[in-house]
């Protein structure tokens, strides 16, 4: 029994869900549109503003894919109605970020600047040169781009320098002590 898969998704006003043959879904909302091909063995139904996912049997694979499909559907509905965001902060002397057109430029203590073009469907806010907010309607793309930004200078445990998520805890280590 999939606890997540059995939950009903409430589709908010202003969001339309179109289910085509073979479980090809199109979700449109005020923030944009997402399309996804889901497993065709599952039955996805829209009754009023309630979206449900049902599986044909209790095989192990069907139980696994049931909850995953429901979570993907919920993320699509949530993304087009409210959107997703990830906040990162930069710590370190001389470390900064700036947005130049459609490119994020990072200065992270290397001999060169790191230039990252924005993927389609992603918008960035850089309120201060040490804060970055990644916004978008696709949760996977937002998380992936935030992880790629963080990858260039992960937080180190001694001084805490690097790029970290705002809610991330970095375990600190004590340095060497003199004898």
From Swiss-Prot:
Q: Does the keyword rRNA-binding apply?
A: yes
Gene Ontology molecular functions: rRNA binding; structural constituent of ribosome
The answer to keyword rRNA-binding applying to this record is yes
Q: According to its record, what are the GO cellular component terms? A: cytosolic large ribosomal subunit
Biological process (GO), any one: cytoplasmic translation
Q: Which UniProt keywords apply?
A: Ribonucleoprotein, Ribosomal protein, RNA-binding, rRNA-binding
The highest taxon in the source lineage is Bacteria
Q: Which family does it belong to?
A: Belongs to the universal ribosomal protein uL6 family.
The record's annotation in NCBIfam families points to: L6_bact (TIGR03654)
Q: How does it assemble?
A: Part of the 50S ribosomal subunit.
Per the entry, what this protein does is:
This protein binds to the 23S rRNA, and is important in its secondary structure. It is located near the subunit interface in the base of the L7/L12 stalk, and near the tRNA binding site of the peptidyltransferase center.
Q: Which HAMAP family match?
A: Ribosomal_uL6_B
Protein name, UniProt field: Large ribosomal subunit protein uL6
